[in-house]
Amino acid sequence: MIQRLLEVGVVKFGDFVLSSGLKSPFYIDLRAVLGHPDLFQWVVSQYLSTLSKLEYDVILGVATGGIPYASVLGYLLQRPFGYVRPEAKGHGAGRQIEGAEVAGKRAVVVDDVLTTGKSVLGAISAVGEAGGRVTAVVVFLDREQCGAEAVRRAGAGVYSVYKMRELLEALRPHIGEGQYRSAVEYLSQWRC
Protein backbone atom coordinates (compact mmCIF):
# COMPACT_ATOMS: atom_id res chain seq x y z
CA MET A 1 0.00 0.00 0.00
CA ILE A 2 2.94 2.35 0.54
CA GLN A 3 3.62 2.40 -3.20
CA ARG A 4 -0.06 3.27 -3.79
CA LEU A 5 0.48 6.47 -1.80
CA LEU A 6 2.90 7.50 -4.52
CA GLU A 7 0.73 6.24 -7.38
CA VAL A 8 -2.38 8.20 -6.35
CA GLY A 9 -0.51 11.42 -5.58
CA VAL A 10 -0.47 11.35 -1.79
CA VAL A 11 3.31 11.72 -1.91
CA LYS A 12 4.63 14.25 -4.43
CA PHE A 13 8.11 15.54 -5.19
CA GLY A 14 8.95 19.01 -6.51
CA ASP A 15 9.05 22.52 -5.05
CA PHE A 16 6.24 23.19 -2.58
CA VAL A 17 5.27 25.83 -0.03
CA LEU A 18 3.55 24.26 2.98
CA SER A 19 0.71 25.80 5.02
CA SER A 20 3.36 26.57 7.64
CA GLY A 21 5.11 28.76 5.05
CA LEU A 22 8.08 26.38 4.84
CA LYS A 23 9.49 25.36 1.46
CA SER A 24 9.81 21.63 0.85
CA PRO A 25 11.03 19.26 -1.90
CA PHE A 26 8.10 16.94 -1.15
CA TYR A 27 4.42 17.28 -0.32
CA ILE A 28 2.11 14.89 1.49
CA ASP A 29 -1.56 15.24 0.54
CA LEU A 30 -3.46 12.67 2.56
CA ARG A 31 -6.73 14.14 1.26
CA ALA A 32 -5.99 12.29 -1.99
CA VAL A 33 -6.66 9.05 -0.08
CA LEU A 34 -10.35 9.97 0.24
CA GLY A 35 -10.95 9.17 -3.43
CA HIS A 36 -9.58 5.63 -3.11
CA PRO A 37 -11.70 3.48 -0.76
CA ASP A 38 -9.15 0.66 -0.54
CA LEU A 39 -6.39 3.06 0.43
CA PHE A 40 -8.68 4.96 2.81
CA GLN A 41 -9.57 1.69 4.54
CA TRP A 42 -5.87 0.83 4.89
CA VAL A 43 -5.02 4.27 6.33
CA VAL A 44 -7.91 3.99 8.82
CA SER A 45 -6.66 0.53 9.86
CA GLN A 46 -3.24 2.04 10.57
CA TYR A 47 -4.82 4.72 12.77
CA LEU A 48 -6.88 2.04 14.56
CA SER A 49 -3.76 0.07 15.38
CA THR A 50 -2.17 3.16 16.93
CA LEU A 51 -5.31 4.25 18.82
CA SER A 52 -5.80 0.79 20.33
CA LYS A 53 -2.82 1.41 22.63
CA LEU A 54 -4.16 4.68 24.08
CA GLU A 55 -6.66 5.72 26.75
CA TYR A 56 -9.06 8.56 25.95
CA ASP A 57 -12.70 9.61 26.19
CA VAL A 58 -13.23 11.54 22.95
CA ILE A 59 -11.70 11.69 19.48
CA LEU A 60 -11.20 15.11 17.91
CA GLY A 61 -10.20 15.75 14.31
CA VAL A 62 -8.20 18.83 13.38
CA ALA A 63 -9.89 20.83 10.61
CA THR A 64 -9.72 19.92 7.87
CA GLY A 65 -7.23 17.13 7.28
CA GLY A 66 -8.03 15.17 10.43
CA ILE A 67 -11.82 15.30 10.20
CA PRO A 68 -12.51 12.40 7.80
CA TYR A 69 -10.22 10.07 9.70
CA ALA A 70 -11.41 11.08 13.17
CA SER A 71 -15.07 10.72 12.19
CA VAL A 72 -14.61 7.17 10.87
CA LEU A 73 -12.46 6.26 13.89
CA GLY A 74 -15.10 7.60 16.29
CA TYR A 75 -17.76 5.56 14.51
CA LEU A 76 -15.72 2.34 14.41
CA LEU A 77 -14.55 2.64 18.01
CA GLN A 78 -17.93 3.85 19.28
CA ARG A 79 -16.34 6.91 20.89
CA PRO A 80 -17.69 10.45 20.95
CA PHE A 81 -16.27 12.41 18.04
CA GLY A 82 -15.84 16.08 17.29
CA TYR A 83 -13.57 18.43 15.46
CA VAL A 84 -11.60 21.56 16.20
CA ARG A 85 -11.57 24.60 13.94
CA PRO A 86 -8.56 26.93 13.76
CA GLU A 87 -10.73 29.57 15.43
CA ALA A 88 -14.27 30.00 16.71
CA LYS A 89 -16.97 30.70 14.14
CA GLY A 90 -18.09 34.29 13.90
CA HIS A 91 -21.74 33.23 13.58
CA GLY A 92 -24.20 30.66 14.89
CA ALA A 93 -23.10 29.22 18.23
CA GLY A 94 -19.61 30.65 17.69
CA ARG A 95 -17.88 27.40 18.60
CA GLN A 96 -14.35 26.35 17.91
CA ILE A 97 -15.01 22.73 18.91
CA GLU A 98 -18.00 20.96 17.37
CA GLY A 99 -19.48 17.60 18.25
CA ALA A 100 -18.31 15.78 21.37
CA GLU A 101 -18.27 17.60 24.69
CA VAL A 102 -14.69 17.90 25.96
CA ALA A 103 -15.07 19.46 29.43
CA GLY A 104 -13.56 17.08 31.99
CA LYS A 105 -12.58 14.61 29.26
CA ARG A 106 -9.35 13.11 27.96
CA ALA A 107 -9.11 13.78 24.25
CA VAL A 108 -7.04 12.27 21.50
CA VAL A 109 -6.47 14.65 18.61
CA VAL A 110 -6.25 13.13 15.13
CA ASP A 111 -4.62 14.88 12.18
CA ASP A 112 -3.24 13.72 8.87
CA VAL A 113 0.26 15.24 8.82
CA LEU A 114 2.37 16.87 11.53
CA THR A 115 4.95 19.44 10.43
CA THR A 116 5.61 22.31 12.86
CA GLY A 117 2.63 21.44 15.07
CA LYS A 118 0.88 24.79 14.67
CA SER A 119 -2.62 23.44 13.93
CA VAL A 120 -2.38 20.67 16.52
CA LEU A 121 -1.14 23.11 19.17
CA GLY A 122 -4.15 25.30 18.37
CA ALA A 123 -6.42 22.30 18.95
CA ILE A 124 -4.67 21.48 22.25
CA SER A 125 -5.18 25.06 23.39
CA ALA A 126 -8.87 25.07 22.38
CA VAL A 127 -9.53 21.81 24.24
CA GLY A 128 -7.82 23.18 27.35
CA GLU A 129 -9.88 26.38 27.19
CA ALA A 130 -13.03 24.23 26.94
CA GLY A 131 -12.08 22.34 30.12
CA GLY A 132 -10.68 19.18 28.54
CA ARG A 133 -7.20 17.75 28.25
CA VAL A 134 -5.44 16.40 25.17
CA THR A 135 -3.52 13.33 26.28
CA ALA A 136 -2.36 12.23 22.84
CA VAL A 137 -2.02 13.38 19.25
CA VAL A 138 -2.18 10.72 16.53
CA VAL A 139 -1.09 11.51 12.98
CA PHE A 140 -0.56 9.37 9.93
CA LEU A 141 2.72 11.07 9.12
CA ASP A 142 5.21 13.01 11.22
CA ARG A 143 7.31 15.02 8.77
CA GLU A 144 10.01 15.20 11.48
CA GLN A 145 10.19 18.99 11.38
CA CYS A 146 9.94 19.66 15.12
CA GLY A 147 6.15 19.38 15.41
CA ALA A 148 6.32 16.31 17.66
CA GLU A 149 8.68 18.06 20.04
CA ALA A 150 6.39 21.11 20.20
CA VAL A 151 3.38 18.91 20.98
CA ARG A 152 5.29 17.05 23.72
CA ARG A 153 6.26 20.39 25.27
CA ALA A 154 2.52 21.18 25.36
CA GLY A 155 2.02 18.05 27.48
CA ALA A 156 0.58 15.56 24.99
CA GLY A 157 2.02 12.31 23.71
CA VAL A 158 2.65 12.05 19.97
CA TYR A 159 2.01 8.89 17.97
CA SER A 160 2.55 8.59 14.24
CA VAL A 161 1.84 5.72 11.88
CA TYR A 162 4.93 6.75 9.91
CA LYS A 163 7.81 9.14 10.29
CA MET A 164 8.92 10.82 7.07
CA ARG A 165 12.29 9.08 6.96
CA GLU A 166 10.55 5.68 7.31
CA LEU A 167 8.19 6.54 4.47
CA LEU A 168 11.05 7.74 2.27
CA GLU A 169 12.98 4.54 2.94
CA ALA A 170 9.95 2.43 1.98
CA LEU A 171 9.49 4.49 -1.20
CA ARG A 172 13.19 4.57 -2.09
CA PRO A 173 13.01 1.86 -4.78
CA HIS A 174 10.13 3.71 -6.46
CA ILE A 175 11.30 7.34 -6.33
CA GLY A 176 14.93 7.05 -7.37
CA GLU A 177 18.08 7.82 -5.47
CA GLY A 178 18.13 11.52 -6.39
CA GLN A 179 14.72 12.32 -4.93
CA TYR A 180 15.41 10.14 -1.92
CA ARG A 181 18.70 11.91 -1.14
CA SER A 182 17.21 15.36 -1.73
CA ALA A 183 14.39 14.68 0.72
CA VAL A 184 16.66 13.16 3.37
CA GLU A 185 19.10 16.07 3.03
CA TYR A 186 16.21 18.51 3.46
CA LEU A 187 15.09 16.72 6.63
CA SER A 188 18.63 16.70 8.04
CA GLN A 189 18.48 20.48 8.53
CA TRP A 190 15.83 20.07 11.25
CA ARG A 191 17.36 19.86 14.72
CA CYS A 192 14.70 19.82 17.36
Swiss-Prot record:
Gene Ontology biological process terms, A to Z: 'de novo' UMP biosynthetic process; pyrimidine nucleobase biosynthetic process
Ordered alphabetically, the record's keywords are:
Glycosyltransferase, Magnesium, Pyrimidine biosynthesis, Transferase
Please name the GO terms that the record assigns under molecular function. magnesium ion binding; orotate phosphoribosyltransferase activity
Q: Tell me which residues bind orotate.
A: 115, 143
- As recorded in UniProt, its EC number(s) are 2.4.2.10
Cofactors demanded by this protein: Mg(2+)
Q: Tell me which Gene3D superfamilies the record gives.
A: 3.40.50.2020
Look at the named UniProt entry and state the broad enzyme category this protein falls under.
transferase
Pathway(s) of this molecule: Pyrimidine metabolism; UMP biosynthesis via de novo pathway; UMP from orotate: step 1/2
Entries under Pfam families matching the protein: Pribosyltran (PF00156)
CDD domains, per database record = PRTases_typeI (cd06223)
Question: Which positions bind 5-phospho-alpha-D-ribose 1-diphosphate?
Answer: 85, 89, 91, 111-119
Family in the record: Belongs to the purine/pyrimidine phosphoribosyltransferase family. PyrE subfamily.
Entry function:
Catalyzes the transfer of a ribosyl phosphate group from 5-phosphoribose 1-diphosphate to orotate, leading to the formation of orotidine monophosphate (OMP).
What NCBIfam families does the record tag this protein with?
A: pyrE
In Swiss-Prot or TrEMBL terms, this protein is called Orotate phosphoribosyltransferase
Q: What is the protein's species of origin?
A: Pyrobaculum arsenaticum (strain DSM 13514 / JCM 11321 / PZ6)
